[in-house]
């Protein structure tokens, strides 16, 4: 039966973040992706408003086809590639939170989770990719970064590149009953959310410990991009701040939010270390005045400006960027620990 555009828009408006419109159009992989990410964080759901006519046309065209295109490679899509990397990282973080206590986690569970996230995006719409090669790429990349939470990023990138290289159109299959499709989606949803819910409810301390370690690694990457670092810090600590605003000091007797307090202290200590590093870059002792910071910055910028060091351009460029980042860190007014909360 042909799919209707008005029905699709109605389902998009009513249950878009849960993927109801994709379920109606037979795009089960897309529906599962939206279920697990709440419509791509809401942004993907809104962006689809202009894409729904093409989705409906694609679904109706697939019903009239007797065989899938053979020997034809789908066009390369930068948006799909970026989504594969992001969802791979997302699946990896969920695995890090919920499955990190497993033996050989970094060898088995982490690359498997990241690879499945990449494959889920690869299977959106009428396309798919090679299952074995994509997972194989994830498993081969994982040992290189063994034991490091930041391994999620290179594993996701490697798996996404492999998935793009082996992209192809899906083979046409007979339509299945809705009950079978819902059963399959339900199992996949439970497999994703079950370990996460168990870890969050029964192992809060260990969960937040791994979250802190992971975000510490990411904050290290952003140490010379203070604006991005502060944004990451704000997102990480948002649940803590909201709970404190609503409940006050009395709401922190539970072990869960005592662990959030420890996590807050971790990020705070990380910012202290970043300021100490900035003092070292500018050649100052901790507690230097704003005038001393500004004077040292101006002197070092003149010394290490790339235009003044043509014989060692790369080294000068590196020092120049470090000096600018350190000055930006120290230029921000530092709030006392109590007021930051």
Swiss-Prot record:
InterPro entries: DnaJ_domain, J_dom_sf, TM2. This is DnaJ homolog subfamily C member 22. SMART domains: DnaJ. The chain crosses the membrane at residues 5-25, 30-50, 81-101, 105-125, 138-158, 185-205, 218-238. Its main location: membrane. Residues 3-50 form the TM2 domain. Residues 277-341 form the J domain. GO terms for cellular component: membrane. PANTHER family: DNAJ HOMOLOG SUBFAMILY C MEMBER 22. SUPFAM superfamilies: Chaperone J-domain (SSF46565). PROSITE patterns: DNAJ_2 (PS50076). Keywords: Chaperone, Membrane, Transmembrane, Transmembrane helix. Coiled coil: none annotated. It is a multi-pass membrane protein. It is found in: Membrane.
């Amino acid at each position: 039966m042909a799919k209707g555009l008005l029905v699709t828009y109605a389902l998009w408006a009513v249950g878009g973040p849960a993927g109801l419109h994709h379920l109606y159009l037979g795009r089960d992989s897309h529906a599962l992706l939206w279920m697990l990410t709440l419509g791509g964080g809401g942004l993907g759901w809104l962006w689809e408003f202009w894409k729904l006519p093409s989705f409906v046309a694609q679904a109706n065209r697939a019903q009239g086809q007797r065989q899938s295109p053979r020997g034809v490679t789908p066009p390369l899509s930068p948006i799909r590639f970026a989504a594969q990397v992001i969802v791979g990282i997302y699946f990896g973080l969920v695995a890090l939170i919920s499955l990190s206590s497993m033996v050989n986690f970094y060898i088995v569970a982490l690359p498997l989770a990241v690879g499945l996230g990449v494959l889920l995006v690869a299977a959106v719409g009428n396309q798919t990719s090679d299952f074995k090669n994509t997972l194989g790429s994830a498993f081969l990349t994982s040992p290189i970064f063994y034991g490091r939470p930041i391994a999620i990023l290179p594993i996701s990138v490697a798996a996404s590149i492999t998935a793009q290289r082996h992209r192809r159109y899906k083979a046409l299959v007979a339509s299945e009953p809705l009950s079978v499709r819902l059963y399959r989606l339900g199992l996949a949803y439970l497999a994703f959310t079950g370990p996460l819910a168990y870890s969050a409810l029964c192992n809060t301390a260990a969960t937040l410990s791994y979250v802190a370690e992971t975000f510490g690694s990411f904050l290290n990457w952003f140490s010379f991009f203070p604006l991005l670092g502060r944004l990451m810090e704000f997102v990480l600590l948002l649940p803590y701040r909201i709970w404190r605003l609503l409940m006050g000091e009395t709401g922190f007797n539970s072990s869960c939010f005592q662990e959030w307090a420890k996590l807050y202290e971790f990020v705070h200590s990380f910012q202290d270390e970043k300021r100490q590093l900035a003092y070292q870059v500018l050649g100052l002792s901790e507690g230097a005045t704003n005038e001393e910071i500004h004077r040292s910055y101006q002197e070092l910028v003149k010394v290490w400006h790339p235009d003044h060091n043509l014989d060692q351009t790369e080294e000068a460029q590196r020092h120049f960027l470090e000096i600018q980042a350190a000055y930006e860190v120290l230029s921000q007014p530092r709030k006392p620990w109590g007021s930051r909360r």
